[in-house]
Amino acid sequence: MLDKHGREINYLRVSVTDRCNLRCVYCMPPEGIIKKEHDNIMRYEEIFKVVKSASLLGVNKIRFTGGEPLILKNIDKLIYNTSKISSIKDIAMTTNAILLEDMVEELKKAGLKRVNISLDSLKEDRFKSITRGGDINKVFKSIEKSLSIGMRPIKINTVIMKGINDDEIDDFMNLTKEYPISVRFIELMPIGEGRRLYKDGYISSEEIISKHSDLIPVETEKSSTALLYKFKESKENIGFISPMSCKFCSGCNRVRLTSEGTLKPCLHSEKEVNLKNYVGNNQALLSKINETIYNKPLEHHMIEEKESKSKKMMYQIGG
């Protein structure tokens, strides 16, 4: 369906849980999070109701996120049921891949089309530091397994932070020459724990691109959040997601469902609607989703204000 600004909204990002088995420095506090009561989070059946209703309004792309979506007990069942909605054309997931190796084959059979893997360092000790305890070898094994079963595309999402991992930019780029893997560099955002790191850690996409004259621009869809490039030798693209230096609001085609059941029309807006109050009434749920999509804000003002208006952490909204 169209919002009031004429944009086609066909993409729903679903945070199935705010819990995670890592505690990345820009996402979660060191002590982790307080576990929510069961009644305060969406059950898998409720999530599916929202997905089904959204599909009736023209949503045909679903991405499951977290927290870490693979710790949700029924994630395979949720993917399978979503795949049976005839109008849903694409089911994707963003994961840290710690648990992916043992699950990816069944998830692919259930209907998962592609994965984005959050990976902010290729160095074992640094990865452990950024994630506060993660085992990078589990991620590497998950990538290898995903490639071996034909999962395509596989994209690596990397948040670049000055003085932390910016010396690995070339190493990440070179992955696209060696493997059929896309890499997405994401600008650090002043949201949640990222506010602490932003002043000293922010690097613009343009700064990175300007240092790589051999990058070749690739045509990008209007709704894409990434500007795409590749090397002559690349097997896949290199993308730059630049919410702080080049916002993509005019082509935005997405809304977000949080693990608490709130529908956010914009990542960086305070505006949200609690759909848990409506999941028992199909018509009311459909109407509330329709209303929220229609009233999606024209744009965010994070570039001008250097801060997101959203008071939620990224693990609550979905990465």
From Swiss-Prot:
<feature type="binding site">
    <location>
        <begin position="254"/>
        <end position="256"/>
    </location>
    <ligand>
        <name>GTP</name>
    </ligand>
</feature>
<comment type="subunit">
    <text>Monomer and homodimer.</text>
</comment>
<feature type="domain" description="Radical SAM core">
    <location>
        <begin position="4"/>
        <end position="227"/>
    </location>
</feature>
<dbReference type="GO" id="GO:0051539">
    <property type="term" value="F:4 iron, 4 sulfur cluster binding"/>
</dbReference>
<feature type="binding site">
    <location>
        <position position="13"/>
    </location>
    <ligand>
        <name>GTP</name>
    </ligand>
</feature>
<keyword id="KW-0547">Nucleotide-binding</keyword>
<protein>
    <recommendedName>
        <fullName>GTP 3',8-cyclase</fullName>
        <ecNumber>4.1.99.22</ecNumber>
    </recommendedName>
</protein>
<feature type="binding site">
    <location>
        <position position="27"/>
    </location>
    <ligand>
        <name>[4Fe-4S] cluster 1</name>
    </ligand>
</feature>
<feature type="binding site">
    <location>
        <position position="189"/>
    </location>
    <ligand>
        <name>S-adenosyl-L-methionine</name>
    </ligand>
</feature>
<feature type="binding site">
    <location>
        <position position="26"/>
    </location>
    <ligand>
        <name>S-adenosyl-L-methionine</name>
    </ligand>
</feature>
<dbReference type="GO" id="GO:0005525">
    <property type="term" value="F:GTP binding"/>
</dbReference>
<feature type="binding site">
    <location>
        <position position="249"/>
    </location>
    <ligand>
        <name>[4Fe-4S] cluster 2</name>
    </ligand>
</feature>
<dbReference type="Pfam" id="PF13353">
    <property type="entry name" value="Fer4_12"/>
</dbReference>
<keyword id="KW-0456">Lyase</keyword>
<feature type="binding site">
    <location>
        <position position="155"/>
    </location>
    <ligand>
        <name>GTP</name>
    </ligand>
</feature>
<keyword id="KW-0949">S-adenosyl-L-methionine</keyword>
<comment type="pathway">
    <text>Cofactor biosynthesis; molybdopterin biosynthesis.</text>
</comment>
<dbReference type="InterPro" id="IPR013483">
    <property type="entry name" value="MoaA"/>
</dbReference>
<feature type="binding site">
    <location>
        <position position="24"/>
    </location>
    <ligand>
        <name>[4Fe-4S] cluster 1</name>
    </ligand>
</feature>
<feature type="binding site">
    <location>
        <position position="266"/>
    </location>
    <ligand>
        <name>[4Fe-4S] cluster 2</name>
    </ligand>
</feature>
<dbReference type="InterPro" id="IPR006638">
    <property type="entry name" value="Elp3/MiaA/NifB-like_rSAM"/>
</dbReference>
<dbReference type="GO" id="GO:0006777">
    <property type="term" value="P:Mo-molybdopterin cofactor biosynthetic process"/>
</dbReference>
<keyword id="KW-0411">Iron-sulfur</keyword>
<comment type="similarity">
    <text>Belongs to the radical SAM superfamily. MoaA family.</text>
</comment>
<dbReference type="InterPro" id="IPR050105">
    <property type="entry name" value="MoCo_biosynth_MoaA/MoaC"/>
</dbReference>
<comment type="function">
    <text>Catalyzes the cyclization of GTP to (8S)-3',8-cyclo-7,8-dihydroguanosine 5'-triphosphate.</text>
</comment>
<feature type="binding site">
    <location>
        <position position="252"/>
    </location>
    <ligand>
        <name>[4Fe-4S] cluster 2</name>
    </ligand>
</feature>
<keyword id="KW-0479">Metal-binding</keyword>
<feature type="binding site">
    <location>
        <position position="94"/>
    </location>
    <ligand>
        <name>GTP</name>
    </ligand>
</feature>
<feature type="binding site">
    <location>
        <position position="63"/>
    </location>
    <ligand>
        <name>GTP</name>
    </ligand>
</feature>
<dbReference type="InterPro" id="IPR013785">
    <property type="entry name" value="Aldolase_TIM"/>
</dbReference>
<dbReference type="GO" id="GO:0061799">
    <property type="term" value="F:cyclic pyranopterin monophosphate synthase activity"/>
</dbReference>
<dbReference type="GO" id="GO:0046872">
    <property type="term" value="F:metal ion binding"/>
</dbReference>
<dbReference type="Pfam" id="PF06463">
    <property type="entry name" value="Mob_synth_C"/>
</dbReference>
<keyword id="KW-0342">GTP-binding</keyword>
<feature type="binding site">
    <location>
        <position position="67"/>
    </location>
    <ligand>
        <name>S-adenosyl-L-methionine</name>
    </ligand>
</feature>
<keyword id="KW-0408">Iron</keyword>
<keyword id="KW-0501">Molybdenum cofactor biosynthesis</keyword>
<dbReference type="InterPro" id="IPR010505">
    <property type="entry name" value="MoaA_twitch"/>
</dbReference>
<feature type="binding site">
    <location>
        <position position="118"/>
    </location>
    <ligand>
        <name>S-adenosyl-L-methionine</name>
    </ligand>
</feature>
<feature type="binding site">
    <location>
        <position position="20"/>
    </location>
    <ligand>
        <name>[4Fe-4S] cluster 1</name>
    </ligand>
</feature>
<keyword id="KW-0004">4Fe-4S</keyword>
